[in-house]
Amino acid sequence: MSDSDLGEDEGLLSLAGKRKRRGNLPKESVKILRDWLYLHRYNAYPSEQEKLSLSGQTNLSVLQICNWFINARRRLLPDMLRKDGKDPNQFTISRRGGKASDVALPRGSSPSVLAVSVPAPTNVLSLSVCSMPLHSGQGEKPAAPFPRGELESPKPLVTPGSTLTLLTRAEAGSPTGGLFNTPPPTPPEQDKEDFSSFQLLVEVALQRAAEMELQKQQDPSLPLLHTPIPLVSENPQ
């Protein structure tokens, strides 16, 4: 056997010895951990503060304590529970058909975090779905005032009292009030044609009245030209 083979064998033996020494914890530390495990055998899941306290008592790191409890719950805890006449499957982490309350208690706050985080995507989806008709509804509303603006365009030109009554009647019978309650913003085409013809009559009457006022101011001796105004205003009735 060569010197290189002897060196390799010695290296393997030294590694094996280190692994064995690394896995063995001090007896006093193990006794403290065993006592804590027995006192909390029905809920053998130490909290973060308890881990720090055990770390100070045993002079071990928190990681070593976590690893020790993981192994102890699988190897030591079932025997402790059987001595008490309990079913280990109801208290250990290896159970599969246990109660939901037993699963939630050892994990601390992790189940509550899951319960809060799961509904979050559904809320986002519900908000995105509900926001679509809201935006579409807001986009449809500005289309309604256009027919109303067309009807009110000759309003500043009104000077006689008879034409003012005609415009107020036209506004009272306009279909724009019902458009805000119905989803489709398109009014009937027949109403548009009726109001367009009525609008032409109003404009002609206003233009005729203005011409008569000018003629009356230029030549006051023509009172007969002012008589046709009431006839024009009564035609739409």
From Swiss-Prot:
Changing residue 186 to V: Decrease of phosphorylation. Strong decrease of phosphorylation. Widely expressed. Highly expressed in heart, kidney and testis. Weakly expressed in brain and prostate. Residues 87-106, 172-193, 213-237 are annotated as: Disordered. CDD domains: homeodomain. Residues 16-79 bind DNA. The C-terminal part is phosphorylated in response to EGF signaling by the Ras/MAPK pathway. The modification Phosphothreonine is found at residues 182, 186. GO terms for biological process: amacrine cell differentiation; negative regulation of transcription by RNA polymerase II; nodal signaling pathway; positive regulation of amacrine cell differentiation; regulation of DNA-templated transcription; regulation of gastrulation. Keywords: DNA-binding, Homeobox, Nucleus, Phosphoprotein, Transcription, Transcription regulation. Residues 103-237 are annotated as: Repressive function. TGIF2 is amplified and overexpressed in several ovarian cancer cell lines. Interacts with the transcriptional modulator SMAD3 and the histone deacetylase HDAC1. Transcriptional repressor, which probably repress transcription by binding directly the 5'-CTGTCAA-3' DNA sequence or by interacting with TGF-beta activated SMAD proteins. Probably represses transcription via the recruitment of histone deacetylase proteins. This is Homeobox protein TGIF2. The lineage of its organism: Eukaryota, Metazoa, Chordata, Craniata, Vertebrata.
